[in-house]
Swiss-Prot record:
NAD(+) binds at residues 47-51, 96-97, 128, 151, 188, 306, 330. This is DNA ligase. It comes from the Bacteria. Gene3D superfamilies: 5' to 3' exonuclease, C-terminal subdomain (1.10.150.20), 6.20.10.30, BRCT domain (3.40.50.10190), DNA ligase/mRNA capping enzyme (3.30.470.30), Helix hairpin bin (1.10.287.610), Nucleic acid-binding proteins (2.40.50.140). Pfam families: BRCT, DNA_ligase_aden, DNA_ligase_OB, DNA_ligase_ZBD, HHH_2, Nlig-Ia. The active site is at residue 130. GO terms for cellular component: cytosol. It catalyses: NAD(+) + (deoxyribonucleotide)n-3'-hydroxyl + 5'-phospho-(deoxyribonucleotide)m = (deoxyribonucleotide)n+m + AMP + beta-nicotinamide D-nucleotide. SMART domains: BRCT, LIGANc. It comes from Rhodopseudomonas palustris (strain HaA2). The gene is ligA. One of its GO terms (biological process) is DNA replication. Keywords: DNA damage, DNA repair, DNA replication, Ligase, Magnesium, Manganese, Metal-binding, NAD, Zinc.
Length: 714
């Protein structure tokens, strides 16, 4: 039985060792939320919770600056671009903004600017509503739109040029009299509230997924692979900034003057933007916009203040992930009181059990709210993400009168309970330890707040994502069987678990795949041939394909090399699963698994949870019955010049593909890493190597060309 996480200790009492562990936990959690927000357009926590996580991490790193790393979320922006779009390097990074949550913090921001610039008077400040949408960068050359990219991680975004050309607010040709030879113009893609409601109504009527809020709908609409879908969505754009400028279109440019030029160039600029000459003016604008917020046709989550003079901006510069010359003043969440009628459990595509409050309908900030996220078991019990008391430790029960808020216009959540209205018969909520969809047992890892269904191979709620993973490039990699086909076959009930893929041909007399639009006898024959070709598979690919939590490609290879053969692996996993008790696992098989270099307790526990679920074992047995052979692991050599060394490949390689280089290095006993650190022994740099090469040089890591690498391993 997994224990609930202990409350996080006060930062002032942390030792360096404990601070390192806590910082790592916070980084992983923040990175998960970044990925959900930036890559999948599906925020998993409120702005307030996210900000609390960031502030705790920032406080730890401030106390222990030696723990700060370049990859920390406090030093980076957003999340890496998704794989479905071409990558675009921003000529000037698209950084995020620091946040202020109180008037005093805005005053402190202005005072910092004055001290830095050694000014006696407050500099002019541009105040603008903070649009809750998707940041976009538009590159124009000689006035013509050449490329559009999302923010991504701030340095590399996604190329969405074709989709952006369908947005009426974005000119394909600049109209201003004076136009720079090259410029990157930036702003926010958003959707009007009324358009969002109409879109969700159409989605619901069509049986399609509805969006949580206008920001999600705008981001999801822009990041469509089918341009026609983007064109059908009512997307808008406000321009408010720029990146690279070959030259400015005026003498002595300022932020406010440049906004006027953007209007001349053909962009829509928010008419609410105001030039302020004092802190009081800026705060008055904040309060006025806050009062008008519900009546505005678009969602905003605060106000952005920017120093007006561009020469001041240049002198102020940046700190890691944000500019010194701008700050976002966030709004307090909007709240209302209602009754929580029921708590339901939803199972996500990755198996997470998420509690949802079903509420008596109530209007919050002009929007009718009927559901609110309860996040996890601890949140219901009255514990925050760090284990500290939340809502003064008051739990949430069915029948309670609760205060609901829309934090940052994202996902409604319950922030407090009106205890004097609690029904006498209201009982504490008991979080289910079984999946409500498939009945498999649920597990909660130590240090995490989420319960997850362990029926990875058989749970209908997870089926599509698990099957996509099963056929992915690093797993079974079946030619002609990708995400689109998996979704189609699953929707028709033909493929529910991995073994079903290998019985398609035997069932085709009844299924008749060749009758599906886009298929024919030749394509079906090729598909069956590709499936048959994967009836023989390498052990590490099979392990990776199972989709066990925390078992990526690297850990799958570690497991395969340790056990060597399928029989040895299965025997050890079943023995370890049989040794699982509520008190822990002291079996010899589990101890052996836990002691594998690079595996550790978290991964070992996840593997055992997988094999402790009988339905997973049954699904795996059904799969193995369809396979011809599982090839033993190729053991890494220990007698080479790179055995035990950590290697990073970067840039465009010409003598081999990245996968070939990685496989060859691993066969020779090297560990291939994805990022450069002090522990890196070699960086093999191809053409156009970027930040990894720079970091390697800064750290004094040995840098090799492809030829030098080949000479080393020959």
């Amino acid at each position: 039985m997994t224990k609930a996480p202990k409350p996080a200790p006060d930062i002032a009492t942390l030792t360096k060792a404990k601070a390192k562990v806590e910082a790592m936990r916070l980084r992983l959690e923040i990175e998960r939320h970044n990925s959900a927000y930036y890559q999948h357009d599906a925020p998993t926590v409120s702005d307030a919770e996210y900000d609390a996580l960031r502030r705790r991490l920032e406080a730890i790193e401030a106390k222990f600056p030696e723990l700060v790393s370049a990859s920390s979320p406090t030093q980076t922006v957003g999340a890496a671009p998704a794989r479905g779009f071409a990558k675009v390097q921003h000529a000037v990074p698209m950084l995020s903004l620091g946040n202020a949550f109180a008037d005093d913090e805005v005053t402190e921001f202005v005072e910092r600017v004055q001290r830095f610039l050694r000014l006696d008077a407050v500099p002019s400040i541009v105040a603008e509503p903070k649009i809750d949408g998707l940041s976009l960068s538009l590159r124009y050359e000689h006035g013509e739109l050449m490329r559009a990219a999302t923010r991504g991680d701030g340095f590399t975004g996604e190329d969405v040029t074709a989709n952006v050309r369908t947005i009426a607010d974005i000119p394909t040709t600049l109209k201003a009299k004076t136009i720079p030879a090259a410029c990157e113009l930036r702003g926010e893609v958003y959707m009007l509230k009324q358009d969002f409601l109409a879109l969700n109504k159409r989605q619901e009527e069509a049986g399609d997924t509805v969006f949580a809020n206008p920001r999600n709908s705008a981001a999801g609409s822009l990041r469509q692979k089918d341009v026609a879908i983007t064109a059908s969505r009512p997307l808008k754009f406000f321009a408010y900034a720029w990146g690279e400028m070959s030259d400015y279109p005026m003498d002595e440019p300022t932020q406010f003057k440049m906004l006027g030029w953007l209007k001349q160039a053909g962009f829509v600029v928010n008419p609410e933007i105001t030039l302020c000459t004092s802190v009081d003016d800026a705060l008055a604008f904040y309060r006025r916009i806050g009062e008008q917020r519900a009546a505005l046709p678009y969602d905003i989550d605060g106000v952005v203040y920017k120093v007006d003079r561009l020469d001041y901006q240049e002198r102020l510069g940046f700190v890691s992930r944000s500019p010194r010359w701008a700050i976002a003043h966030k709004f307090a969440a909007e709240q209302a009181t209602t009754v929580l009628e029921k708590i339901d459990i939803q199972v996500g595509r990755t198996g997470a059990l998420t509690p949802v409050a079903r509420l008596q309908p109530v209007t919050v900030g002009g929007v009718v709210v009927q559901n609110a996220t309860l996040h996890n078991e601890d949140y219901i019990k009255g514990l925050g993400n760090d284990g500290s008391p939340l809502r003064d430790g008051v739990d949430i029960r069915e029948g309670d009168t609760v205060v609901v808020q829309r934090a940052g216009d994202v996902i409604p959540q319950i922030v407090s309970v009106v205890l004097d209205k609690r029904p006498a018969d209201a009982t504490p909520y008991h979080f289910p330890h079984k999946c409500p969809v498939c009945g498999s047992h649920a597990a909660r890892e130590e240090g995490e707040a989420v319960w997850r269904c362990t029926g990875a191979l058989i749970c209908p709620a997870q089926a599509v994502e698990r099957l996509k993973h099963f056929v992915s490039r690093l797993a079974f990699d079946i030619d002609g069987l990708g995400e689109k086909q998996i979704v189609l076959f699953h929707e028709r009930g033909w493929v529910k678990e991995p073994a079903d893929i290998f019985t398609l041909q035997a069932r085709n007399a009844a299924l008749k795949l060749e009758d599906i639009e886009g298929y024919g006898e030749t394509s079906v024959r090729n598909l069956f041939a590709a499936i048959d070709a994967r009836r023989t598979i390498e052990l590490h690919r099979l392990i990776f394909a199972l989709g066990i939590r925390h078992v990526g490609e690297g850990n799958a290879k570690l497991l395969a090399r340790h056990y060597g053969t399928l029989d040895a692996f299965l025997a050890a996993m079943r023995a370890a699963a049989e040794g699982q008790t509520e008190e822990g696992n002291t079996s010899e098989a589990y101890q052996d698994l836990d002691n594998i270099a690079g595996i550790g307790e978290v991964v070992a526990a996840a593997v055992v949870e997988f094999f402790a679920e009988p339905r997973n074992v049954a699904a795996l047995d059904a799969l193995l019955a369809e396979l011809k052979d599982v090839l033993p692991a190729e053991q890494a050599r220990r007698d080479t010049a790179v055995a035990g060394k950590t290697v990073v490949f970067t840039g465009s390689l010409t003598k081999f593909t990245r996968d070939e280089a990685k496989a060859a290095a691993e066969r020779l006993g090297a560990k291939v890493a994805g990022s450069v650190s002090k522990k890196t022994d070699y960086v093999v740099a191809g053409a156009d190597a970027g930040s990894k090469l720079t970091k390697a040089k800064d750290l004094g890591v040995a840098v090799l060309t492809e030829d030098e690498w080949l000479a080393l391993i020959s």
